[in-house]
């Protein structure tokens, strides 16, 4: 239980760090917060690359770590709670069935393992989506007419995993994203 609380505290620490970086990102150089506080336009390749690094290091990676910590917290806390609940139930009816406790622990473990797999799958998807970003950067350096990336962010959906994946993916492809 104490390990679960520790992982939970680390999880929320990572969450607030990524959230603060998210709001700080709105005032990244090159934005126009007075007119469009959630619209980020980056026309220069150097600035766009710096923004890309900041987005991953300051927001996406801490958010992924937060999800992992939360998963481990769930794993330790729910396993302990499940075993105690099952134990109390079996004692109340004078039936000691340890298999029920083991089955509950296995179910909670598989559910948390599935959530980790989901996070890893989204990360792999975002990595493979980056080839358009690199190709566009090369086109910009070669002198092609390349407009800056647009990334519309809705803060209300920051913690929504689907919107995060969609937002990062279309930002890497330099397409406008409307997350509502």
Q: Could you tell me what each predicted segment is?
A:
Residues 1-102:
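Membrane-proximal first intracellular loop
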């Amino acid at each position: 239980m104490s390990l679960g609380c520790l992982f939970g505290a680390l999880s929320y620490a990572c969450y607030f760090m990524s959230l603060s970086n998210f709001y700080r990102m709105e005032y990244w150089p090159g934005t126009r917060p007075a007119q469009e506080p959630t619209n980020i336009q980056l026309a220069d390749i150097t600035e766009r690359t710096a923004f890309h690094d900041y987005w991953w290091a300051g927001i996406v990676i801490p958010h992924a770590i937060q999800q992992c910590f939360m998963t481990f917290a769930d794993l330790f806390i729910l396993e302990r709670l499940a075993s105690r609940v099952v134990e109390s139930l079996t004692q109340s009816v004078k039936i000691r069935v340890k298999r029920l406790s083991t089955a509950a622990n296995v179910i909670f473990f598989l559910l948390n393992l599935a959530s980790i797999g989901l996070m890893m799958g989204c990360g792999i998807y975002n990595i493979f989506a980056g080839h358009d970003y690199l190709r566009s950067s090369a086109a910009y350096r070669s002198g092609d007419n390349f407009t800056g990336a647009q990334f519309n962010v809705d803060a209300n959906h920051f913690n929504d995993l689907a919107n995060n994946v969609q937002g990062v993916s279309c930002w890497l492809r330099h397409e406008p994203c409307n997350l509502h």
